[in-house]
């Protein structure tokens, strides 16, 4: 079964994220558990936790259908010791918040070398950061997102994801989230079913589907291989509809959150309905 949703706002309280997801007929959702552009946040109150869990129960969202995202400020591969420590502390806090909320996944961008250390050193720092966070938490899987490769961001090659996983001690609590826009911008073609087959055959060989814990379904304003991260609505960008239809009809993408981060929230309900219909199309055929 496919879990299909969007990254919804948690404004006014975390419970509202589940309510907003239900309003667009989503069977999955993503959210920030705190302000994504601030380092610190007030601890979660018992009331906030209880209200969130109650809303998820009311609208039938289990932890397998929810893909929280951490703060954009965190850089787990930071070249400077003090800044790395700050990022690690913030990441542990994000993991602990998920733990408190009964969530089992935390999606994050791996990190950037800022032109100050080698890719290999940065990837090793990211893996070490994950190990530290896993040691201090329970039950939450660290889900590494592939990137478009803007600036000095790592994670734009499947080999980067594999190298990070290789350095993580507890393989049962690490996974990846593949963002289609990021992959396309990083040079993984998705414009035809044949290209999708090739890209995900590479993914299976280099990383492995057992590590796929979520996806971000985004078309791309950015051009192929441009290393520029610019999302678009499904079918309106340079990837086109075929990739998303192909994903919907492949059972390797079952049982994980498939999350829209497309640019027009007003049509998320339509995009979700369209994605759901592609599954039915296969079933009828």
Curated annotation (Swiss-Prot):
Membrane-spanning segments: none
Q: Which reaction does it catalyse?
A: Endonucleolytic cleavage to 5'-phosphooligonucleotide end-products
Per UniProt, Zn(2+) 1 binds at 69, 109, 145
- EC number annotated for this UniProt entry: 3.1.21.2
According to the record, the signal peptide region is none
What Gene3D superfamilies does the database record attribute to this sequence? Divalent-metal-dependent TIM barrel enzymes
Any matching Pfam family? AP_endonuc_2
Q: Which residues bind Zn(2+) 3?
A: 182, 229, 231
Question: What cofactor is this protein dependent on?
Answer: Zn(2+)
Q: Which UniProt keywords apply?
A: DNA damage, DNA repair, Endonuclease, Hydrolase, Metal-binding, Nuclease, Zinc
Q: Name one GO molecular function term.
A: DNA binding
Cofactor binding note of this UniProt entry? Binds 3 Zn(2+) ions.
**What residues bind Zn(2+) 2, as annotated?**
145, 179, 216, 261
A Gene Ontology biological process in which this protein takes part is: base-excision repair
Its annotated function is as follows:
Endonuclease IV plays a role in DNA repair. It cleaves phosphodiester bonds at apurinic or apyrimidinic (AP) sites, generating a 3'-hydroxyl group and a 5'-terminal sugar phosphate.
Entries under NCBIfam families matching the protein: nfo, PRK01060.1-4
Protein name from the UniProt record: Probable endonuclease 4
Q: Could you tell me which species this protein originates from?
A: Escherichia coli O1:K1 / APEC
């Amino acid at each position: 079964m496919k879990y299909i949703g969007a990254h919804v706002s948690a404004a006014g309280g975390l419970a509202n994220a589940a309510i907003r997801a239900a309003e667009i007929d989503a069977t999955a959702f993503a959210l920030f558990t705190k302000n994504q552009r601030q380092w610190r946040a007030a601890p979660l109150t018992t009331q906030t936790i209880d209200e969130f869990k109650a809303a998820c129960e009311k609208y039938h969202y289990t932890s397998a259908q929810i893909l929280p995202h951490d703060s954009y400020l965190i850089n787990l591969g930071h070249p400077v010791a003090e800044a790395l420590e700050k990022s690690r502390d913030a990441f542990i806090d994000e993991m602990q918040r998920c733990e408190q909320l009964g969530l089992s996944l935390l999606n994050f961008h791996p990190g950037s070398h800022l032109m100050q250390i080698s890719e290999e050193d940065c990837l090793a720092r990211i893996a070490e950061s994950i190990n530290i966070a896993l040691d201090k938490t329970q039950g939450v899987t660290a889900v590494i997102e592939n990137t478009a490769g803007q600036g000095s961001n790592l994670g734009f090659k499947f080999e980067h994801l594999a190298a990070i996983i290789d350095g993580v001690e507890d393989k049962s609590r690490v996974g990846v989230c593949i963002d289609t826009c990021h992959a396309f911008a990083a040079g993984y073609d998705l414009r035809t079913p044949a290209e999708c087959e090739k890209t995900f055959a590479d993914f299976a060989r280099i990383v492995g589907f057992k590590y796929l814990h979520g996806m971000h379904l985004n078309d791309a304003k950015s051009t192929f291989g441009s290393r520029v991260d610019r999302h678009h609505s499904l079918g309106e960008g340079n990837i086109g509809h075929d990739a998303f239809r192909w994903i919907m009809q492949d059972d390797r993408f079952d049982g994980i959150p498939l999350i829209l981060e497309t640019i027009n929230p007003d049509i998320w309900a339509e995009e979700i309905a369209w994605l759901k219909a592609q599954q039915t199309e296969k079933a009828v055929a």
